[in-house]
């Protein structure tokens, strides 16, 4: 991967031109419009087979012109895989690494695994481009790379981590929320085989300004990320993907480089349309490409049958799995429609209507949340979102767009809802957040199993080592081996947490109740505590230098690592079943291999470690949690926190936020002057109000 050091910022490139000559801005504007698409499609735009064929063919044309061989995937907005194409000579496998450009060695986690199918990398990149983007923002895998690393921006020192630190381990193949592909295009949202991707070369696709899907390309054999934002890369994956999206590119005014996050400009791409050496007119039909030996559609077990390209779904119609909700159910306290949306199955039934809990918080069934309370929580949170100013959407002043999930103390989904045009990634993530806050607030549980006991029952994480190069599919399984070191155990994180906090019974059934919001748990999951200064110790749920990377983050990955490897083995054709729809309790590459032992629903789709959730209490009794995701993390915090507070005020049933004296920010951590954070709300959050500090004192 060659680096081209530039001192010009992206806006200067747009204004003055860069790359292959002419005006960069003019070329980018032209990339948005597809002359061949004559019929207007708005508002019901979707990717037709002709669109999918064109996107793939344009990628192949650019790769061929550069003498490269690529693997290309196209998905619709909810993750239906519409095409996977592999050029002759393309690498069958990629290596996961965060150190390809930066040097150094990281041992453990997913680092250095070199037997990952290139098809899975391409699919995850395409899904990332689709899931992070909406009609108000267009983010790419390069944007993802920028916002998930240990410092924001990457390459800077002594600054906090990225706002979406940890989001890469969402949409997991073992998620109990994400759908699984069938023989036909069907209702989503669907899983991503490797979670979300930070490897440049994944872009959203648009028609008439409407987000309709994503494209992912892998050609360099490396599944990595960009650790330095002080330059612009020449990245072959990204260049080919830029060619693929010609005519289907995001409107320039909503691209990531038009969005600021805590005062820093997001990055959309380091490659531009005027750098291409092919044009859309060079694209040949897939039949012609097959006939001349350039490449073919390829089957990917669990995702795509390889027979033919497919049309996508119309987002917002029942066929997509997301549709408008009943306005008489999702309404504010005055009966006004909240313009909410819900997730539906293939029969157009709401997958997650509000329902009463069946747990017994504090040993009493009367403490369990009722269906009416759950619906009010969803409505109040959506109402707060509709009143709030978005962080990552254009134009400034747009409403926040999010997904909300409510769970009981066992992690069972009690209800989900979303606002119009919220990014898809927020669905699975909001559920992760709700479950994580609830789970880690379970110290002193009088009913059910305490978190420490559940974690101690999880099988050990079985890190694998890379296999000899070049990877031979016929001997791959025989060459797989478990690393001797590091060899983490999940129970080790429990011990580390208790020691770090100075609370020996934290997470235990006998301990005093402590309420952890996701912001609190996220503080404990950073490679340095407190988040930012690089001379602090690793958080107890993180890892030390030499072991930590975005592909080896600590408990968040180790809890689901075995399940991810189970899925990779299944796709590779190893004679094992696909991973169950529960990310916990997988034995991994052990004897017996890929079995489930002591699985639990509390974290069934994995845990999340960036802000946007709070536990829900009735008095001083934990009764569940709420998670919000889709916009800025401070907005997510506020929507969840105020949603619970306003529900409590409206219903007067004792439901509310955790009492202040129980919150994690009250813990005095030994040898630390910085306390955990609970929630952080925007200073001036509402569109039509000058109200400030809206969460203070609550």
Language-model features and meaning:
Residues 22-698:
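Flexible, solvent-exposed loop/hinge segments and secondary-structure transition points
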Residues 12-15:
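C-terminal motif of bacterial Sec signal peptides marking the signal peptidase cleavage site
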Residues 17-21:
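Bacterial signal peptide processing site
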Residues 2-7:
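Sec-dependent signal peptide recognition
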Residues 8-10, 209:
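N-terminal non-cleavable signal-anchor helices
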């Amino acid at each position: 991967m060659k680096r081209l050091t530039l001192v010009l910022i992206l806006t200067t490139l747009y204004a003055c031109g860069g790359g292959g000559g002419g005006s960069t801005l003019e070329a980018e504007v032209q990339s948005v419009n597809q002359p061949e698409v004559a019929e207007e499609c708005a508002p019901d735009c979707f990717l037709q087979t002709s669109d999918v064929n064109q996107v793939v063919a344009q990628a192949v044309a650019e790769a061929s012109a550069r003498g490269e061989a690529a693997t290309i995937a196209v998905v619709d907005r909810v993750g239906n895989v519409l095409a996977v194409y592999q050029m002759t000579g393309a690498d069958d496998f990629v290596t996961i690494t965060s150190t390809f450009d930066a040097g150094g060695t990281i041992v453990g986690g997913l680092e250095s695994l070199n037997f990952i199918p290139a098809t899975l990398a391409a699919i995850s990149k395409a899904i990332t481009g689709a899931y992070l983007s909406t009609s108000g923002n267009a983010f790419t895998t390069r944007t993802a790379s920028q916002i998930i690393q240990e410092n924001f921006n990457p390459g800077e020192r002594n600054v906090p981590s990225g706002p979406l630190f940890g989001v890469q381990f969402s949409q997991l193949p073992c998620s109990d929320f994400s759908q699984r592909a069938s023989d036909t295009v069907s209702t989503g949202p669907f899983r991503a085989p490797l979670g979300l991707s930070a490897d440049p070369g994944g872009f959203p696709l648009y028609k008439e300004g409407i987000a309709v899907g994503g494209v992912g390309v892998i050609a360099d054999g490396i599944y990595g990320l960009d650790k330095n934002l002080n330059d612009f890369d020449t990245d072959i994956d990204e260049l080919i993907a830029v060619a693929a999206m010609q005519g289907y590119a995001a409107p320039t005014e909503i691209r990531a480089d038009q969005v600021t996050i805590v005062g820093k400009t997001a990055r959309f791409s380091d490659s531009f349309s005027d750098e291409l050496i092919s044009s859309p007119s060079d694209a040949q039909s897939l039949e012609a490409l097959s006939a001349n030996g350039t490449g073919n559609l390829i089957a990917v077990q669990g995702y795509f049958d390889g027979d033919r390209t497919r049309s996508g779904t119309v987002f917002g119609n029942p066929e997509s799995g997301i549709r408008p909700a009943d306005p008489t159910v999702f309404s504010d306290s005055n009966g006004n429609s909240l313009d909410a949306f819900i997730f539906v199955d293939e029969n157009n039934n709401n997958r997650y209507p509000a329902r009463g809990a069946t747990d017994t918080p504090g040993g009493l069934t009367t403490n369990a949340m009722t269906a009416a309370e759950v619906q009010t929580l969803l409505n109040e949170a959506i109402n707060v979102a509709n009143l709030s100013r978005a962080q990552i959407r254009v134009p400034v002043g747009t409403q926040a767009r999010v997904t909300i999930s409510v769970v009981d103390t066992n992690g069972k989904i009690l209800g989900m809802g979303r606002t119009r045009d919220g990014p898809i990634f927020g669905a699975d993530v909001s559920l992760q957040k709700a479950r994580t806050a609830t789970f880690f607030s379970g110290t002193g549980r009088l009913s059910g199993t305490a978190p420490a006991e559940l974690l101690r029952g999880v099988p050990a994480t079985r890190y694998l080592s890379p296999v000899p190069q070049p990877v031979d599919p016929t001997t791959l399984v025989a060459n797989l081996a478990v690393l001797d070191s590091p060899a983490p155990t999940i129970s080790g994180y429990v011990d580390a947490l208790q020691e770090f906090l100075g609370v020996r019974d934290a997470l235990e059934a006998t301990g005093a109740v402590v309420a952890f919001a996701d912001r609190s748990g996220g503080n404990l999951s950073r490679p340095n505590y407190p988040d930012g200064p690089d001379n602090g110790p690793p958080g107890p749920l993180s890892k030390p230098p030499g072991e930590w990377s975005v592909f080896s983050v600590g408990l968040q990955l180790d809890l689901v690592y075995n399940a991810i490897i189970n899925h990779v083995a299944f796709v590779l054709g190893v004679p094992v079943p696909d991973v169950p729809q529960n990310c916990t309790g997988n034995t991994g590459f052990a004897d017996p291999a890929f079995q489930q032992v002591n699985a639990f629903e509390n974290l069934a789709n994995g845990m999340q470690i960036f802000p946007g959730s709070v536990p829900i209490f009735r008095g001083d009794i934990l009764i569940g949690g709420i998670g919000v995701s889709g916009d800025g993390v401070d907005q997510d915090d506020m929507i969840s926190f105020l949603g619970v507070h306003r529900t409590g005020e409206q219903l007067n049933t004792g439901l509310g936020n955790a009492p202040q004296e129980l919150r994690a920010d009250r813990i005095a951590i030994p040898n630390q002057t910085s306390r955990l954070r609970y929630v952080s709300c925007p200073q001036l959050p509402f569109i039509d109000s000058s109200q400030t500090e809206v969460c203070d004192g609550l």
